[in-house]
Amino acid sequence: MAKTAIQTSQENQPVIQVENVSKLFRTPNEGAISALQSVSLNISHGEFITVVGPSGCGKSTLLKLIAGFSPPSSGRILCQNEEVRGLNTKVGYVPQESKLFPWLTVEENVGFGLDSKRYPREKREHQVQQFINLAGLAGFEKYYPAQLSGGMSKRASIIRALAYEPAVILMDEPFGPLDAQTRMVLQDELLKIWEQKRQTIVFVTHDLVEAVALADRVVVITHRPGQIKDIINVSMKRPRNIFEIHRQEGFDEAYGRLWNIFRHELNIGMH
């Protein structure tokens, strides 16, 4: 089906606009701590953005501001051209911990976010099953979180955020606690789901290989107070083979540039 002029115009508009945003935290002992300073960033419809930077640089803070968990101290954030004021219901949020509801089954957890959409029962069941199948969890619909492995819990947590199809998915180091092999499998599955659904993803990670492997663009944040140091365009073609990512044309160039920038920030943080 051909896209209308309105649809094309909407897709060309940034889905997220971060405009000169700063964030201060006040502590009893240290006074005001500047977590982010003068951050501006536009994120397009369907983009996969990864965010990297030294520990404590404000990566997670940026996600929480976009999610509306707390307001910026100055500047503003827009989601689909509307300023974020309070909880942003247009985004899905995947934290580092799976945080599935232990009293709900896999299919109930995945369908939880759909309740607010008031889907007819048949459509709701189809949507839940579609994402369960995409995540390789078919056959585990009736399992409870305590019966799942760490990797399976993470899959369920991710598709719970994806299933109600928010405009943007915010992912805060979702694969951090997992072993290397499970991480690669989940990276591959995430990319396959994203290729089909093309939801906008903003993905925080401390893993530079992961950052390059997944992203259209990598945003590098400086040591605190966090500012955008650079944005690296990743020219690797899609679809990508996570299991042979080091051999893919464009990987070495993007990774080398990212490492040089990141190494400089680490050196600054140590002085």
Which sequence ranges carry the predicted segments?
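A short, flexible loop at the N-terminus of ABC-type nucleotide-binding domains that lies
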Residues: 11-15, 24-38
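Conserved ABC ATPase signature
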Residues: 144-148, 152
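Conserved ABC transporter NBD signature motif
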Residues: 75-87
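Helix-to-loop junction immediately C-terminal to a conserved catalytic motif
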Residues: 67
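Short coil-to-helix segment of the ABC ATPase nucleotide-binding domain corresponding to the Q-loop/switch region
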Residues: 104-111
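Conserved ABC ATPase "signature" region
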Residues: 111, 115, 122-140, 192
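The feature captures the beta-strand-to-loop junction immediately N-terminal to the Walker
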Residues: 52-54
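A short, proline-enriched helix->beta-strand linker immediately N-terminal to the Walker B motif
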Residues: 163-167
